[in-house]
Amino acid sequence: MEIDTNRKTTLAFKLLAINPSAFGGIIFKGATPEHTESILNFFKISDVNLNKIFSNFSVTDLTGGIDPLESLQKGYLVYRKGILSRPGWFSCTSMNDMPKSLQSMLTYQMDNINLSPIIAFDDGSRKDEVAPPKLCDRLAFSIDLTEVRFNQFSPEFFPITSSKTTKAEITEAQIQSVIVSAIKFGIDEIRPAYMTINAAQYLATLDDRVTVEQKDLNLAATLILAHRALIIPEEIEDDQKDEPQKEN
């Protein structure tokens, strides 16, 4: 199932707004300044703060702690809050330059507190530049803008509401089908399957339905599993067809 970049981005932002803890965030690859400006329009429409996390931040900048400079100036220990305590979403302006200590603390916080969505930018221009894998694993969505002209990138952004969205019902058979699909794609971790199941349930709700249908599963897999795929299922089937059959 293929969907265009604009719709994919719109759906990703809708799902992140509904349940940040289930989906973590989104990665934009190859975004130009013009692309970034379009993305920032979401925050202008929604009146949501975007807190920037820079690669030179310390762990204390993230989580808070003693401010050494102000403590020296005032003569007593001064504590300050970290950026993660602020309301709003978060932006990692350059994932590739983020030191491992900062990556580890950010992923730890994502696993242990209800963190707002993270918008990450993968600006790696060389083949040897790799975005932090542990952080990428926790961000459900990935949008590749490398081949998308800035004047063709116009997602339908929307204001965020505080109303709670319920999840549509999903059957055990549908859950099993998601897990099987993930395995066929060569994905052996449970997190992407969990994200896909949640996405299917919320996509059904957004379509005013109380139960998940196959089209929800297909769309959720396209949004979350496709860019993680290590194996293309069609290739597996072709390989199996080429194998000589055993004689009885």
Model-derived features with residue positions:
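Amphipathic alpha-helical interaction segments
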Residues: 177, 194-199, 216-219
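AAA+ ATPase "lid" subdomain C-terminal helix
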Residues: 183-190, 197-212, 223-231
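Conserved ASCE/P-loop NTPase catalytic core
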Residues: 1-149
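Conserved C-terminal "switch" segment of AAA+ ATPases
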Residues: 140-180, 184-193, 209-210
